[in-house]
Regions:
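AMP-binding (ANL) adenylation modules
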Residues: 73-75
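Radical SAM enzyme core and accessory elements
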Residues: 80, 90-187
Length: 187
C-alpha cells in the first residue's frame, strides 16, 4: 500500500487524495481481516521537513504493516515535481542512484540536506524493524512457521543494505565539512 507520508500537509502537497486517518483505518481493517500489508513510504516529497519525516516514521509504526519499503523522492524530467524542484533550485544533481542500484537523494530543501534524508531512510528501517513487536513477528515466523530459509535470506539482504546505507551516510557527512551547509547544485 502506497501510504507515501504520515504528514497531512505532505499528502496535500502531492495531491494524494487520501488522509492519514483514512490510511490508518485501511491498515486496521486489513489487519483485522488477517490481510498482510506492505507499506510504502517516500522521504523528500515536496515540502518535506525534519518534522514531517518524523511524523511519517511515527505514523508507520502505528500502522504495524508486515513489511515496509522506504524510498527517496526523485524528480523525473517532464513531471510537475521536476519542474517545481528545478524552478526552486532544489535539485542538487541529476544522479538518482549510485551505480549499484541504491537510491541517492538529489532533492535538497532549505534545512533538509540530502545526507539527512539518506540518514533518515536508514533510521526509518531501524526504528520500524527493531521494535519489540516487529522483532517478535520475525522470530515467531522463523520458529513457529519454520520459515527460516526465507527469513535468513531476507535478514542477510536487509543487514547488507543497511551497512551500505550507513556507509553512504558517513561518506556524505565526511564530504561536507559543515553538515548545516547545503550541497552545491550540480555536484
Amino acid at each position: 500500500m502506497g501510504f507515501e507520508s504520515g504528514d497531512p500537509q505532505i499528502l496535500k502537497n502531492i495531491k494524494k487524495g487520501a488522509t492519514v486517518e483514512r490510511a490508518r483505518a485501511f491498515a486496521k481493517d486489513c489487519n483485522d481481516l488477517g490481510l498482510v500489508v506492505h507499506g510504502d513510504f517516500i522521504l523528500g516529497l515536496p515540502g518535506e521537513t525534519k518534522e514531517s519525516i518524523r511524523n511519517t516514521i511515527n505514523f508507520a509504526k502505528t500502522l504495524d504493516c508486515e513489511t515496509i519499503q522506504v524510498s527517496i523522492a526523485h524528480a523525473y524530467p517532464g513531471t510537475e515535481f521536476y519542474d517545481y524542484a528545478k524552478s526552486n533550485g532544489f535539485i542538487t544533481n541529476e544522479r538518482m542512484e549510485d551505480g549499484g542500484g541504491h537510491q541517492m537523494a538529489h532533492i535538497e530543501y532549505p534545512g533538509l540536506p540530502v545526507d539527512y534524508v539518506m540518514e533518515m531512510v536508514h533510521r526509518f528501517y531501524d526504528e520500524y524493524y527493531f521494535r519489540p513487536k516487529a522483532a517478535f513477528r520475525v522470530i515467531w515466523k522463523a520458529v513457529i512457521n519454520r520459515d527460516v530459509p526465507r527469513l535468513y535470506v531476507e535478514a542477510k539482504a536487509f543487514l547488507k543494505l543497511r551497512a551500505q546505507r550507513n556507509k553512504m551516510v558517513k561518506e556524505a557527512r565526511s564530504a561536507r565539512p559543515d553538515p548545516t551547509t547545503p550541497a552545491k547544485a550540480g555536484v
